[in-house]
């Protein structure tokens, strides 16, 4: 029996989606598709869609949904997506979700990683980075041997602007505004029998969340 693993991941920045996406990819051998990577690849390859996207991006304009969906369809028609794929960061809006559905892409699972805002702020504002190497630490979960210093070089660690609490809160506000309608949309789709919707507690240990995913996806 052919398994189908067409999955959408929902979750705020810092909710642990990336870690679990890696787990799903390794376990089921399906690729993760991020629209950012797709645009970069299409632009690099000089495809027709890539050229259109580049022209818009160069003018600082947003790429319209039709173009993004066309790019997604193009990407998921590749052989490595035969058994499924993980969509991360798309769809972001109801029109994108509708366009995806209208283009005949049936989603098997929607997985939402739920983490309270205050936990995300703690996770992200505790990050420290060694700029030259990209090595990252966390003051609570993965502290450096010497406070504020890189383990290898002993150089100073920095807080990325993106990880400052006020920036994180701004990003979370945008995320909730954009994503709550999608949560409602896919829960309604699940109620109609068109997909399966699961909300996972992202505050649990990584291994626990992975085990839960394993039993959901089988």
From Swiss-Prot:
EC number(s) given by UniProt: 2.7.4.3
Keywords of this entry: ATP-binding, Cytoplasm, Kinase, Nucleotide biosynthesis, Nucleotide-binding, Transferase
Places the protein is found: Cytoplasm
Residues at which AMP binds: 35, 40, 61-63, 89-92, 96, 160, 171
Pathway in which this enzyme or protein is active: Purine metabolism; AMP biosynthesis via salvage pathway; AMP from ADP: step 1/1
GO cellular component: cytoplasm
GO MF term set: adenylate kinase activity; ATP binding
Claim: Nucleotide-binding is one of the keywords in the record: yes
Gene Ontology biological-process annotations: AMP salvage
Family: Belongs to the adenylate kinase family.
Functional summary from the UniProt entry: Catalyzes the reversible transfer of the terminal phosphate group between ATP and AMP. Plays an important role in cellular energy homeostasis and in adenine nucleotide metabolism.
Record protein name field: Adenylate kinase
Organism the protein comes from: Mannheimia succiniciproducens (strain KCTC 0769BP / MBEL55E)
Gene: adk
């Amino acid at each position: 029996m052919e398994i189908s693993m067409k999955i959408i991941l929902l979750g705020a920045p810092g909710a642990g989606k990336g870690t679990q996406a890696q787990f799903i990819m390794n376990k089921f051998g399906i690729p993760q598709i991020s629209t950012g990577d797709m645009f970069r690849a299409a632009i690099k390859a000089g495809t027709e869609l890539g050229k259109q996207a580049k022209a818009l991006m160069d003018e600082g304009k947003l790429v319209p949904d039709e173009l993004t969906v066309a790019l997604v369809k193009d990407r998921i028609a590749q052989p490595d997506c035969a058994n499924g794929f993980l969509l991360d960061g798309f769809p972001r809006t109801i029109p994108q979700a509708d366009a995806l559905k209208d283009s005949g892409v049936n989603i098997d699972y929607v997985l939402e990683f739920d983490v309270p805002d205050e936990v995300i702020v703690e996770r992200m504002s505790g990050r420290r980075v060694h700029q030259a190497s990209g090595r990252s630490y966390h003051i609570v979960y993965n502290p450096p041997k010497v406070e504020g210093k890189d383990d290898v070089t002993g150089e100073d660690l920095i807080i990325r602007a993106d990880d400052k609490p006020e920036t994180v809160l701004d990003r979370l506000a945008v995320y909730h505004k954009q994503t709550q309608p999608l949560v409602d949309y896919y829960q309604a789709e699940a109620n109609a029998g068109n997909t399966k919707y699961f909300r996972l507690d992202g505050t649990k240990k990584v291994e626990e969340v992975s085990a839960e995913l394993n039993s959901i996806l089988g």
